[in-house]
């Protein structure tokens, strides 16, 4: 609804805006798992900045060091100059993330976004191998710039490019054929047949869980087979951990569950800790064949984000507490969603860690559930090729009570949409998510 308070968005901001159309209010403050709008209404956040706020809004553990850094006139814009904040981040990344996992990676700062990281990864893979094609998968999403779009599956997003998207080919993701065709049968055949007309690719890029694609979860054995396939054919393996990294699936890296070591990893979103723009590309040392300045970006040295990223790593990843808590909360979400899905035909669930989805055979129901949930004080969005999946991405730091409250609103919204009345036992408040 357009009001005097929202008219400026309608009159001045581009039609490309999206989220505000689904959540038609003006937000003012946020803390932890909550946002508040101008009317003082509270909303539980099961969206978390599309995965950029794994540690919640304005986490005090991160906020105070950021305030102190700014107050001390610390470097803000540093390009790729050496700064004290960058040094501390690199040291903490090495000691807290790499060393305990036995990883040997070089670190590149490509720019502030996940798409920047993907573009750099694709560019590096092609440079190192001398090959052009990159393989990706059905329903993949890797960003909105041209290179990232070329390895993205969604037709609507690809259409926005306005030019042919070349030097990429798409393969079936795990479960694409509903387990009626052996995994990798097509991929292996065309790669190994010299008459297939299919040139050996530079790399394969994959999400271990496809977030925008509909919460499609790759099985451990599928990921292991993919890693082996790439290694045997000297194809670089890129894992896009922009949304699923930084603990979203439980471990820091989403690929840890499969025991594989990608050649290249892209990180963004929650790597900055506080929601500040930051992206990293990690790669094996022998792949570091960049010439100085061969790839750059004006805002690759966002030092305030270095500060909050370092504190987040030190605070949340020095032990296994967050990983264990995420897995426990994820099990609760899975159980609750399975219960509500069992009450209605045409519903199915999927997920890992604290990324979960509930899919509807009637895609229109997913959007209606999100609308009802918003009216009752919960932010959730849809994903999938037809927006048929309600996607849950709560902050990893959400409390058990907040998680229960959000699930109560969500399951009540599902009940309302699927039956037209509140048949289930869950209380579904008509107005706002009252903080408990």
Swiss-Prot record:
TM helices/strands, residue ranges: none
Cofactor(s) the protein requires to work: pyridoxal 5'-phosphate
N6-(pyridoxal phosphate)lysine modified-residue sites: 269
Entry EC no(s): 2.6.1.76
SUPFAM superfamilies: PLP-dependent transferases
Keywords per UniProt: Aminotransferase, Pyridoxal phosphate, Transferase
Entry-linked InterPro entries: Aminotrans_3 (IPR005814), Aminotrans_3_PPA_site (IPR049704), Dat (IPR004637), Ectoine_EctB (IPR012773), PyrdxlP-dep_Trfase (IPR015424), PyrdxlP-dep_Trfase_major (IPR015421), PyrdxlP-dep_Trfase_small (IPR015422)
Domain of life assignment: Bacteria
Family per record: Belongs to the class-III pyridoxal-phosphate-dependent aminotransferase family.
UniProt-recorded name of the protein: Diaminobutyrate--2-oxoglutarate transaminase
């Amino acid at each position: 609804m357009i009001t005097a308070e929202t008219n400026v968005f309608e009159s001045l901001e581009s039609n490309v805006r999206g989220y505000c159309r689904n959540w038609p209010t003006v937000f003012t403050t946020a803390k932890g798992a909550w946002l508040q709008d101008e009317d003082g209404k509270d909303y539980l956040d099961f969206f978390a900045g599309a995965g950029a706020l794994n540690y919640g809004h304005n986490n005090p553990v991160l906020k105070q060091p950021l305030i102190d850094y700014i107050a001390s006139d610390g470097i803000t814009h540093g390009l790729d100059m050496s700064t004290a904040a960058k040094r501390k981040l690199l040291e903490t990344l090495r000691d807290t993330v790499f060393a305990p996992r036995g990883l040997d990676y070089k670190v590149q700062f490509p720019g502030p976004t996940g798409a920047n990281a993907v573009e750099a990864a694709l560019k590096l893979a092609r440079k190192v191998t001398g090959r052009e094609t990159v393989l990706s998968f059905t329903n993949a999403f890797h960003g909105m710039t041209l290179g990232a779009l070329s390895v993205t599956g969604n037709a609507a997003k690809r259409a926005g490019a306005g030019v042919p998207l070349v030097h990429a080919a798409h393969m079936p993701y795990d479960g694409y054929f509903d387990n009626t065709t052996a995994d990798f049968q097509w991929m292996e055949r065309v790669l190994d047949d010299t008459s297939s007309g299919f040139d050996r690719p530079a790399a394969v890029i994959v999400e271990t869980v496809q977030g925008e694609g509909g919460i499609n979860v790759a099985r451990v054995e599928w990921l292991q087979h993919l890693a082996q396939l790439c290694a045997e054919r000297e194809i670089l393996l890129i894992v896009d951990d922009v949304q699923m990294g930084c603990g979203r699936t439980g471990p820091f890296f989403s690929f840890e569950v499969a025991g594989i070591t990608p050649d290249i990893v892209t990180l963004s979103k929650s790597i900055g800790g506080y929601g500040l723009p930051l992206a990293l590309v990690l790669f094996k040392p022998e792949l570091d064949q960049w010439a100085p300045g061969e790839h750059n970006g004006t805002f690759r040295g966002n030092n305030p984000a270095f500060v909050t990223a370092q504190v987040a790593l030190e605070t949340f990843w020095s032990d296994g507490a967050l990983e264990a808590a995420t897995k426990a909360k994820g099990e609760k979400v899975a159980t609750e969603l399975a219960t509500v899905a069992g009450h209605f035909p045409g519903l199915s669930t999927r997920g890992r860690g604290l990324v979960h989805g509930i899919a509807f055979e009637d895609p229109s129901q997913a959007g209606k559930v999100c609308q009802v949930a918003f009216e009752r004080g919960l932010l959730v969005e849809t994903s999938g090729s037809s927006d048929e999946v309600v996607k849950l991405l709560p902050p990893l730091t959400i409390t058990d009570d907040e998680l229960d409250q959000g699930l109560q609103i969500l399951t009540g919204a599902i009940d309302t949409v699927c039956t037209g009345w509140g048949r289930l036992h869950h209380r579904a408040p008509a107005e706002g998510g009252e903080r408990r």
